[in-house]
UniProtKB/Swiss-Prot annotation:
Disulfide bonds: none annotated. Is involved in the reduction of 2,3-digeranylgeranylglycerophospholipids (unsaturated archaeols) into 2,3-diphytanylglycerophospholipids (saturated archaeols) in the biosynthesis of archaeal membrane lipids. Catalyzes the formation of archaetidic acid (2,3-di-O-phytanyl-sn-glyceryl phosphate) from 2,3-di-O-geranylgeranylglyceryl phosphate (DGGGP) via the hydrogenation of each double bond of the isoprenoid chains. Can use both NADH and NADPH as electron donors. It catalyses: 2,3-bis-O-(phytanyl)-sn-glycerol 1-phosphate + 8 NADP(+) = 2,3-bis-O-(geranylgeranyl)-sn-glycerol 1-phosphate + 8 NADPH + 8 H(+); 2,3-bis-O-(phytanyl)-sn-glycerol 1-phosphate + 8 NAD(+) = 2,3-bis-O-(geranylgeranyl)-sn-glycerol 1-phosphate + 8 NADH + 8 H(+); a 2,3-bis-O-phytanyl-sn-glycerol 1-phospholipid + 8 A = a 2,3-bis-O-(geranylgeranyl)-sn-glycerol 1-phospholipid + 8 AH2; CDP-2,3-bis-O-(geranylgeranyl)-sn-glycerol + 8 AH2 = CDP-2,3-bis-O-(phytanyl)-sn-glycerol + 8 A. It is found in: Cell membrane. Binds 1 FAD per subunit. Pathway: Membrane lipid metabolism; glycerophospholipid metabolism. Keywords: Cell membrane, FAD, Flavoprotein, Lipid biosynthesis, Lipid metabolism, Membrane, NAD, NADP, Oxidoreductase, Phospholipid biosynthesis, Phospholipid metabolism. Belongs to the geranylgeranyl reductase family. DGGGPL reductase subfamily. Its EC number is 1.3.1.101. One of its GO terms (cellular component) is plasma membrane. NCBIfam families: DGGPL_Thplmales, GG-red-SF. This is Digeranylgeranylglycerophospholipid reductase.
Length: 396
């Protein structure tokens, strides 16, 4: 049997950040990763804002940054004038395009340097509970089953998260309309603008969008995400993306060198994400932005918050629901309002026709985005396209 103050299940950005901060707080910390290699396989567009690195005290390093972009462009179905957002206005997925595998390894190394133990190829097999409190996990490590006892467990086991369900948290179960199926190529020999990440809306990606994340030197991540309510299987999803690439002048002569697929949760903030002795972070806590599908930044922030409350709980020997809810309060304050707004937008956008989407993009592209407001958009739409105001009022 092994004993720790903190057990972190999962070695992604949320888990590594939680482990790093817990270790920095002087807590004996173990992080486990089920795969033999942290950061692999990559299932992500690899976009991240600069601000999150600063907030989490992560020094930008060219070893894990493939490209730095100025902003994002959002195209309507006609692909005429796009909405252009500078990086500071474009959200948590715009600023850097990462080498995600190297980034995840870097974060794990920071956790280890802070004092955390790291075990790879060590999946959690079950939850250990004592008197209603999560008290550790059964782990397969070095071909043995090991009981690891911990005062606090932080579950960062991603979209496929099992640990929370094993412990009895039902909130992490997703409705079908809150699951996106995603497929992405890494492409070479492409001709795309290296200064902007591009997003394409409309029937080319039903109830979702297509993205192009430039990585520099003729390389880009080109992917599609669509609701599983609209796409029946990944072959259909692949056909949509292949059709887009064939018709894109800068992509059609490129070659794909990697194909990755996966699922993404796009729900409102779900509670509870704690119980005595357990907190969920990142994708495991369903903290993916419902409109962008991005989750790296939210995973990092939630990992920081989890470590902060863990420190307080261990120092006071208090693992009550009231203590655990301090973490939930931080999560709600940071994410709840934004995720609700973006969830409503996601649901509404899925129902808009290509013609209406074009009109919306046309209006917003004309606005001065430093002073943009709901009132300004509605007024502009009423003046130019009065027939679609009713259709859009719930969205904006």
């Amino acid at each position: 049997m092994e004993t720790y103050d903190v057990l972190v299940v999962g070695g992604g950005p949320g888990g590594s950040t939680a482990a790093r901060y817990a270790a920095k707080y002087g807590l004996k910390t173990l992080m486990i990763e089920k795969r033999p290699e942290i950061g692999s396989p990559v299932r992500c567009g690899e976009g991240l804002s600069k601000g999150i690195l600063n907030e989490a005290d992560i020094k930008a390093d060219r070893s894990f940054i493939a490209n730095e972009v100025k902003g994002a462009r959002i195209y309507g179905p006609s692909e005429k004038r796009p909405i252009i957002l500078q990086s500071e206005k474009a959200g948590n997925e715009v600023g850097y395009v990462l080498e995600r595998d190297k980034f995840d390894k870097h974060l794990a190394a920071l956790a280890a340097k802070a004092g955390a133990d790291v075990w790879v190829k060590s999946p959690a097999l079950g939850v250990i509970k004592e008197n209603g409190k999560v008290a550790g996990a059964k782990i397969r490590h070095n071909n043995e089953i090991v009981d690891v006892r911990a005062k606090m467990v932080i579950a960062a086991d991603g979209f496929e998260s099992e640990f929370g369900r094993w412990a009895g948290l039902k909130s992490v179960i997703l409705a079908r309309n809150d699951i996106i199926s995603a497929l992405q190529y890494r492409m070479i020999n492409v001709d795309v603008d290296p200064d902007y990440t591009d997003f394409y809306l409309g029937s080319i990606a039903p109830a979702g969008y297509i993205w192009v994340f430039p990585k520099g030197e003729g390389m880009a991540n080109v992917g599609i995400g669509s609701s599983i309510n609209w796409i029946h299987n990944r072959f259909e999803l692949k056909n949509y993306l292949d059709r887009f690439i064939e018709n894109h002048p800068g992509l059609k002569k490129g070659q794909d060198i990697q194909l990755v697929t996966g699922g993404v949760s796009v729900s409102k903030v779900k509670m509870p994400i704690t119980m005595p002795g357990l907190m969920l972070v990142g994708d495991a806590a369903r903290l993916i932005d419902p409109i962008t599908g991005g989750g790296i930044a939210n995973a990092i922030v939630s990992g920081m918050y989890a470590a902060q409350v863990t420190k307080e709980a261990i120092e006071s020997n208090d693992y009550s629901p009231q203590m655990m809810q301090k973490y939930e309060k931080l999560i709600k304050e940071r994410f709840e309002r934004k995720h609700l707004r973006n969830w409503v937008a996601k649901e509404k956008l899925a129902m808009l026709s290509d013609d209406t989407l074009d009109k919306l993009v046309d209006i917003v592209s004309e606005q001065v985005l430093t002073t943009i407001s709901v009132e300004a958009i509605l007024k502009a739409i009423a003046e130019k396209y009065p027939e679609v105001v009713k259709e859009l009022e719930d969205l904006i």
